[in-house]
Curated annotation (Swiss-Prot):
Co-factor requirement: Cu cation
Topology within the bilayer: Multi-pass membrane protein
Catalysis performed (reactions): 4 Fe(II)-[cytochrome c] + O2 + 8 H(+)(in) = 4 Fe(III)-[cytochrome c] + 2 H2O + 4 H(+)(out)
Function: Component of the cytochrome c oxidase, the last enzyme in the mitochondrial electron transport chain which drives oxidative phosphorylation. The respiratory chain contains 3 multisubunit complexes succinate dehydrogenase (complex II, CII), ubiquinol-cytochrome c oxidoreductase (cytochrome b-c1 complex, complex III, CIII) and cytochrome c oxidase (complex IV, CIV), that cooperate to transfer electrons derived from NADH and succinate to molecular oxygen, creating an electrochemical gradient over the inner membrane that drives transmembrane transport and the ATP synthase.
Segments on the Mitochondrial matrix face: 46-59
Protein residues bound to Mg(2+): E198
Listed GO MF terms: copper ion binding; cytochrome-c oxidase activity
UniProt lineage: Eukaryota, Metazoa, Chordata, Craniata, Vertebrata
Subunit text: Component of the cytochrome c oxidase (complex IV, CIV), a multisubunit enzyme composed of 14 subunits. The complex is composed of a catalytic core of 3 subunits MT-CO1, MT-CO2 and MT-CO3, encoded in the mitochondrial DNA, and 11 supernumerary subunits COX4I, COX5A, COX5B, COX6A, COX6B, COX6C, COX7A, COX7B, COX7C, COX8 and NDUFA4, which are encoded in the nuclear genome.
Keyword terms of this UniProt record: Copper, Electron transport, Magnesium, Membrane, Metal-binding, Mitochondrion, Mitochondrion inner membrane, Phosphoprotein, Respiratory chain, Translocase, Transmembrane, Transmembrane helix, Transport
Protein's UniProt keywords contain Mitochondrion: yes
Phosphotyrosine carried by residues: Y218
Protein's gene: MT-CO2
Source organism: Bubalus depressicornis (Lowland anoa)
Protein name: Cytochrome c oxidase subunit 2
A biological process from GO: ATP synthesis coupled electron transport
Length: 227
């Protein structure tokens, strides 16, 4: 989860988030090299006497500054497209969970079970126990099995919302009348926090998301106790 004064991303907990972190580092390195080159050219212009100011044609230079940016854009676009296709790919999910956004809470339905659904409200600050996180704790966590492909169906019953869990690399818009889907897979157990990431009204900041990733046998016990 995030902590105060954090500058980087949260620790990756899914293969998709790991890919996003690698892409971020890759793109940042390209931006750093371009920025260094621009600063170097500016420093040369400021510290040396300008020459060839009357040049009307420089075919080689024009060729270079046309081809080089094209190559840089390709180096950025290819890994980006690869990750986009990976995020849209859904193959034989082990579990499907439908989440609906409301003003201002989330409801969840495990569609593989006959009657397993619940609402998830934020716990007010006055009711928090020692060690719990302000504006992030909920009364009903979303319990899911780790190391399994899970499909999330996301929609809304009123206004636009967005279901987002940063450490898993997830952000899916909840649109009334439309069913969006995404996949997630956690590589380790734990609690993973998120929030609504689309301004949806006065209590937009009070729609936390808590995923509890557990081994399969514990998930089976939990699901049996909820039925």
């Amino acid at each position: 989860m995030a902590y105060p004064m954090q500058l980087g991303f949260q620790d990756a907990t899914s293969p998709i988030m790991e890919e996003l972190l690698h892409f971020h580092d890759h793109t940042l390195m390209i931006v750093l090299l371009i920025s260094s080159l621009v600063l170097y050219i500016i420093s040369l212009m400021l510290t040396t006497k300008l020459t060839h100011t009357s040049t009307m044609d420089a075919q080689e230079v024009e060729t270079i500054w046309t081809i080089l940016p094209a190559i840089i854009l390709i180096l950025i676009a290819l890994p980006s497209l690869r990750i986009l296709y990976m995020m849209d790919e859904i193959n034989n999910p082990s579990l499907t969970v439908k989440t609906m956004g409301h003003q201002w809470y989330w409801s969840y339905e495990y569609t593989d079970y006959e009657d397993l659904s619940f609402d998830s409200y934020m716990i007010p600050t006055s009711e928090l126990k020692p060690g719990e996180l302000r504006l992030l704790e909920v009364d009903n966590r979303v319990v899911l099995p780790m190391e399994m492909t899970i499909r999330m169906l996301v929609s809304s019953e009123d206004v636009l919302h967005s279901w987002a869990v940063p450490s898993l690399g997830l952000k899916t818009d909840a649109i009334p009348g439309r069913l969006n889907q995404t996949t997630l897979m956690s590589t380790r157990p734990g609690l993973y926090y998120g929030q609504c990431s689309e301004i949806c009204g006065s209590n937009h900041s009070f729609m936390p998301i808590v995923l509890e990733m557990v081994p399969l046998k514990y998930f089976e016990k939990w699901s049996a106790s909820m039925l």
